[in-house]
Amino acid sequence: MPFLTVAGARAHYVHRRPVPASRPPVVFIHGAGGTHQQWLYPVRDLSLSLTYALDLPGHGKSEGPGRDSITAYSDWLVAFLDALGLEQAVLVGHSMGGGIAQDVALRHPDRAAGLGLIATGARLRVTPAIFDGLRQDPEAVVRLVCDLVFGPETPPEMVRLGRRQMGAIPPDVLCGDFVACDAFDVMARLGEIGVPTLVLCGSQDVMTPVKYSTYLRDQIRGATLHLVEGAGHMVMVERPDAVLQALTTFLQQLQQSKL
């Protein structure tokens, strides 16, 4: 389980290095209250790509305080890429992680070789009830969020695992994540993104509905949209095979476009 020093604190990540690695490196970014564990299937099974899945600061095994803005998280991500020695990577982000990926593409366009925007949006408003609940009963908020993020066909044991994983995130870090999401809004700037982009979401996502992904597809030049039927917000956990197939096709097309 490798660690790097990023912004003065230890950052944890997992990675896979196939031989040969003939496609651009891929960095997976989890969402609010998440960890690298949500990306274990694509990290393990995405062939021909050097893959990394990280724990954002304050999450999982990464040390340091969490952040309370998307720009602060994206600055941290750029420092993470520097520490790895990666000049460019395909940034694949889920929910808040998708916001981070968009922000890097807008403010540090030379660092993004492509984007995978998974169950996310150009604006990520959070209901005030979440913030009220975090102050009064964080455990209840975790239960509520996990009841919403999984699709109707999700096995109960997967929902319970999600609750345990999110419940392990310190409440102040979780609150900072939601503050970051609530303030995020790049709806007017999507036309500035100039890298190949895959947009993917579940048809039953109630957190970032399909219309969010449709807007991303329509506003980012050349973006493609892949809809996973029956899946909810945690589409990469619920339907890892479908997400892996879509990412593989996207990376193949990205590689061919650079030949």
Task: Go through each PLM region and give its residues.
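Short beta-strand/loop motif that positions the catalytic acidic residue
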Residues: 193, 199-201, 205
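Active-site loop/oxyanion-hole signature of alpha/beta-hydrolase fold enzymes
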Residues: 9, 41, 50-93, 245
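Conserved alpha/beta-hydrolase "acid-adjacent" motif
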Residues: 206-212
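Flexible "cap/lid" loop of the alpha/beta hydrolase fold
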Residues: 102-142
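Catalytic active-site module of serine/aspartate enzymes centered on a nucleophile-bearing elbow/loop
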Residues: 223-259
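Conserved HGGG/HGGXW glycine-rich cap/lid loop of the alpha/beta-hydrolase fold
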Residues: 9-63
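Conserved alpha/beta-hydrolase "nucleophile elbow" surrounding the catalytic nucleophile
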Residues: 30, 89, 93-95, 202
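Conserved alpha/beta-hydrolase catalytic His-Asp/Glu region
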Residues: 133-194
